[in-house]
Swiss-Prot record:
Keywords attached to this entry: Mitochondrion, Ribonucleoprotein, Ribosomal protein, Transit peptide
PANTHER family (alphabetical): MITOCHONDRIAL 28S RIBOSOMAL PROTEIN S24 (PTHR21244), SMALL RIBOSOMAL SUBUNIT PROTEIN US3M (PTHR21244:SF1)
Organism field: Bos taurus
GO BP: mitochondrial translation
Protein name: Small ribosomal subunit protein uS3m
Major localization listed first in the record, in broad terms: mitochondrion
Family statement: Belongs to the universal ribosomal protein uS3 family.
Gene Ontology cellular-component annotations: mitochondrial inner membrane; mitochondrial small ribosomal subunit
Pfam families named in the record: MRP-S24
Length: 167
C-alpha cells in the first residue's frame, strides 16, 4: 500500500496514480522489507554435517586452497562475453542436475578449451551402467547441438558422497 503526500499542505491525501497535480510526490511503502543476506559458506554446526572439500573452504580461498569451478578465458582483460559464459554455466549446471537426478556427488567443473566444452563430475553409483551410458550420450548430443560445439562429459563414479570433514 502506498500513501501519497502532497507537499503543499499539512494533511495527507490519498491520490490516484495520475500525476496531474503540481506538487511534490512522496511515497510511503508499508510492506515489510525482506533482507536476504547470505554468506557463501557452510554454517558451522555441531560437527554432524558432512561437507566436501569445496564446501569446507570459504570463497576467499579460491586459487589458494581450492580451484575455480568454471575455467575459461572470459574474465581476462580485453575479453568479451563474460556474462554469457556465466549464464551458460548456470544452464549447464541446472541441466546436469536435472539429467542426473540425485546422482551428482559434488559440484561440476566446467572447462572451455578452444571450441570444446568439457564437463567433469563425480557421480554416485545409483543407476545401472547402461542408463549412465544413455544419459552421457543424450547429454553430449543435446548440448553439442545446442551450443554448436563439441561437449564432452568426463564422469567418475564413486560409491558414496566424498566427505572431507564434518562441520
Amino acid at each position: 500500500m502506498v500513501a501519497l503526500y502532497c507537499g503543499g499542505g499539512l494533511r495527507p491525501l490519498m491520490l490516484s496514480w495520475s500525476r496531474d497535480l503540481p506538487c511534490i510526490w512522496r511515497a510511503l511503502h508499508t510492506s515489510a522489507v525482506c533482507f536476504k543476506n547470505r554468506a557463501a559458506r557452510v554454517r558451522v554446526g555441531k560437527g554432524n554435517k558432512p561437507v566436501t572439500y569445496e564446501e569446507a573452504h570459504a570463497p576467499h580461498y579460491i586459487a589458494h586452497r581450492k580451484g575455480w569451478l568454471s575455467l575459461h578465458t572470459g574474465n581476462l582483460d580485453g575479453e568479451d562475453h563474460a556474462a554469457e559464459r556465466t549464464v551458460e554455466d548456470v544452464f549447464l549446471r541446472k541441466f546436469m542436475l536435472g539429467t542426473f537426478p540425485g546422482c551428482l556427488a559434488d559440484q561440476l567443473i566446467l572447462k572451455r578449451r578452444a571450441n570444446q566444452v568439457e564437463i567433469c563430475a563425480l557421480v554416485l553409483r545409483q543407476l545401472p551402467a547402461h542408463k549412465f551410458y544413455f544419459l552421457v550420450g543424450y547429454s553430449e548430443t543435446l548440448l553439442s547441438h545446442f551450443y554448436k560445439c563439441p561437449v564432452r562429459l568426463h564422469l567418475q563414479t564413486v560409491p558414496s558422497k566424498v566427505v572431507y570433514k564434518y562441520i
